[in-house]
Regions:
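Structured C-terminal helix/loop/strand segments within mature extracytoplasmic catalytic/sensor domains
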Residues: 29-42, 55, 63, 410-452
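Beta-lactamase-like hydrolase cores
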Residues: 130-171
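Active-site helix/loop module of the DD-peptidase/beta-lactamase fold
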Residues: 208-242, 270-273, 300-337, 341
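Conserved catalytic neighborhood of penicillin-recognizing serine enzymes
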Residues: 223-252, 257-279, 286-289, 341-344
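Active-site Gly/Thr loop motif
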Residues: 320-324, 371-427
Length: 452
């Protein structure tokens, strides 16, 4: 009888399951992909929708359009917005995830038993009434440059680039800014990986304060093997050699870190080595997550104190008055991806770099740090990445061939840019939601030509 039941199980359940799995495999989907797909899709959907609605203040229709551009698969999910609780539920075939908003620190996925975010507080200071960059006032607009920039933004969007903000700073003053309909100088824009460049600066501030050295190794007690030889500088250069891939297919390390684990740092600390540290560059949001973990550990005794300290002693002197820096469920500031700010505030990051680490009368990092941050890394495969900043010419193939060799930038998904041209005392900010590659070299070369 038991043997017959086993045969029936095989015939009616196992065999069809194997056939379905084989059919998906023919289409290129592995069992690991299929197993993780519902969790990853609903996690991404809930997180994006929550932040779009309650951080960026988009309506449901705009959020739905942006989510579809990010991935058409996410448009297949069902979304429920609870405006009273500021929570979003995303569901797919019976599988659902929720993300919740919290005052001052935005949205993140909910995980049972993880309440660390509820202990965090981002101190809200009274806005400084002063001219940019100390405050928010702009009275230095050049009418000619303003018209040129507005024309460029309109042309971008005629071409389908979905540019939402362009801003130009020349010699320390905002001389032009243009916004797409529905966006203003007070709109918050997600910088995606531009947050990585800010993480690099936070490490620099800790070095200036004597709280770390970039040559340090033995960084975390969980690393009692070959990983103990990884240095802070290798994390900054993304040459740490950890077995992490910036691939967002379900089952890969990137979505697992961001959308399937409550503590991004704990997940990264569990990964083994793949390469010898310092030898090979591999783009890694995980490296930046570990840097943020280190920042909070070296800043204060707990996450709540660290977040308040960074708000008071890093972002406030920088002059970033309208921003949201999201954390994961374990209370870690997600410096790999999730910092929202106005175009004027993003420009302050570029101006800080242009000023050699000083802004608004306060030194944030040393001038030596800025110089080292903009040096090519020593990897054997890709050297145009400094301390979380992209460099124009570290190889024979410039990133922006029409611009000087010493140009550098913060870059983010959907073609976000804060680009600095030191030779012309220029900072250029581009923010949007591009579905494909943006014409940044063409536009930035044109903008630079206006100031020659």
């Amino acid at each position: 009888m038991k043997r017959m039941l086993r045969w029936l199980l095989a015939i009616f359940i196992v065999v069809p399951l194997l056939l379905v799995t084989a059919a998906w495999a023919v289409l290129g989907y592995s069992p690991v992909y299929l197993y993780n797909a519902p969790s990853v899709a609903t996690g991404i959907g809930a997180k994006l929708a929550c932040s779009m609605r309650y951080v960026m203040a988009q309506n449901e229709q705009q959020a739905a359009a942006d989510i579809k551009i990010y991935s058409p698969i996410l448009a297949l999910l069902d979304y429920h917005y609870d405006d009273e609780q500021r929570r979003v539920r995303a569901s797919l075939a019976g599988y659902e995830r929720t993300a919740s908003w919290q005052e001052g620190i935005g949205c993140y996925l909910d995980y049972a038993g993880f309440t660390e975010r509820q202990r965090l507080h981002w101190p809200q200071a009274e806005a400084v009434v002063a001219d940019w960059p100390q405050g928010y006032n702009v009275s230095s607009i050049d009418p000619v440059k303003q018209q040129q920039l507005a024309t460029m933004l309109a042309e971008d969007n005629t071409l389908g680039h979905d540019t939402r903000a362009l801003l130009v700073v020349h010699k320390g003053q905002v001389v032009a800014e243009a916004y797409a309909p529905g966006y203003t100088e007070r709109s918050l824009f997600l910088g995606w990986s531009m947050a990585k460049s800010i993480t690099g600066l936070m490490i620099g501030q800790l070095e200036m304060q004597g709280k770390l050295e970039v040559t340090e190794t033995g960084l975390f007690p969980q690393w009692q093997d070959g990983r103990s030889s990884i240095s802070i500088e290798q994390l900054l250069h993304m040459t740490d050699g950890l077995a992490y891939d910036e691939i967002y297919d379900p089952g890969a390390t990137a979505p697992a870190m961001l959308f399937q684990h409550p503590s991004a740092a704990a997940y990264m600390l569990s990964l083994p080595l793949r390469d010898e540290p310092g030898r090979h560059y591999r783009y890694s949001s995980g490296s930046t997550v570990l840097l943020n973990h280190l920042v909070q550990q070296r800043t204060a005794a707990n996450n709540a104190a660290a977040v308040e300290h960074l708000a008071e002693h890093f972002f406030r002197p920088l002059g970033m008055q309208r921003m949201v820096y999201e954390t994961d469920a374990a209370g870690l500031l997600m410096g790999s991806s999730y910092l929202y700010a106005t175009a004027r505030d993003w420009a302050k990051v570029g101006q800080l770099m242009l000023n050699g680490g000083e802004i608004n009368g306060t030194r944030i990092v040393t001038e030596d740090w800025i110089q080292r941050a903009l040096q090519p890394n020593g990897s054997d495969n890709k050297r145009d990445f400094g301390y979380q900043w992209w460099l124009n010419k570290a190889t024979d193939k410039p990133r922006w061939p029409g611009l000087p060799d010493n140009v550098f930038a913060a870059q983010g998904n959907r073609e976000q840019r804060v680009l600095v041209i030191p030779d012309q005392d220029l900072v250029i900010v581009r923010l949007g939601w591009s579905p494909g590659k943006y014409r940044d070299n063409e536009n930035f070369v044109e903008i630079a030509s206006w100031f020659r």
